[in-house]
Amino acid sequence: MAQAKMQHPVSWVIFAGMAALLLFQGVPVRSGDATFPKAMDNVTVRQGESATLRCSVDNRVTRVAWLNRSSILYAGNDKWCLDPRVVLLANTKTQYSIQIHDVDVYDEGPYTCSVQTDNHPKTSRVHLIVQVSPKITETSSDISINEGGNVSLTCIATGRPDPTITWRHISPKAVGFISEDEYLEITGITREQSGEYECSASNDVAAPVVQRVKVTVNYPPYISDAKSTGVPVGQKGILMCEASAVPSADFQWYKDDKRLAEGQKGLKVENKAFFSRLTFFNVSEQDYGNYTCVASNQLGNTNASMILYEETTTALTPWKGPGAVHDGNSGAWRRGSCAWLLALPLAQLARQF
């Protein structure tokens, strides 16, 4: 801290010089010395807060000062430093205190309360500890890698005390932390390990800070669903082909080694990220047969075969049970009314009563 250039009484200058000399020579006051007033223990504050340094005195003290290392901050009521953040808080018969506002890391270190009593200057020291919230200063960029490759992720953070860094995989299947280090190494990465990885830095000074890195794992297509389908002639038919791949697969359809093009009469090919749909609007005899779905990306290709076959409808057998009525005009049988069958037994029951 800068020193103020001002005139001070000679006695103060001599006292301050002796205090600085004692400080430089490392002359401490014993903790068990009950005859000498003591400064407080270590003071811990967070960056940006105010630190109060207190020194207990009594009526035997004739002069008192606060020093930071070899720089005099206050001597009595006189301010010796130019730092506007340092103010005198109390100068009484029992206490001599200063306060430092908006504390920063460079304020950390030893502070000394120096007193003059019985013509002998003595000192008592307090250490100011400045805590700093964690801050992530460097992380890996999002990465894209082929399945089976090795991945190294970095997360560098600062803070006081030094923050603890942890890595975890943001995935429903992930359990707990996968690393408690600045570096996360993944050997032979699989497609299940793709997704976001979160770096967290914490030191209990403030809430943890987090940053995420996206890891994309590329792999060749894998067809997960391709089923044969039966459709009657003249009906609408659909063949589906589902495939997983990163990057997304391109789909192609073939019938008997002949590629089917989009817009071909009576057909529609609809390709999405993870599936392809081949639609027949009016199935004919010529449409039946073997079809092949081919899924491909930069890493490879795969195919699956399926059959579009004719599905025949089974005619319902005409009803010829009790109450069936034959239509003489059409020759068809239909279910007739059964009311006349119930009339006779009901009439017989009525006569008995």
Swiss-Prot record:
Q: Which residues form the signal peptide?
A: 1-28
Q: Does the keyword Repeat apply?
A: yes
Q: Name one Pfam family in it.
A: Ig_3
Give me the residues lipidated as GPI-anchor amidated serine.
S330
**Disulfide links within the chain:** C55-C113, C155-C199, C241-C293
The record, for Gene3D superfamilies, names: Immunoglobulins
Q: Which GO terms describe its biological process?
A: cell adhesion
Question: Which InterPro entries does the record match to this protein?
Answer: Ig-like_dom, Ig-like_dom_sf, Ig-like_fold, Ig_I-set, Ig_sub, Ig_sub2, IgLON_domain, Immunoglobulin_dom
The Ig-like C2-type domain extends over 37-124, 134-216, 220-314
What's the stated role of this polypeptide?
A: It may be a cellular address molecule specific to Purkinje cells. It may represent a receptor or a subunit of a receptor complex.
Subunit relationships: Interacts with NEGR1.
Q: Which family does it belong to?
A: Belongs to the immunoglobulin superfamily. IgLON family.
Q: What is this protein called?
A: Protein CEPU-1
| Phylogenetic placement of the source organism | Eukaryota, Metazoa, Chordata, Craniata, Vertebrata
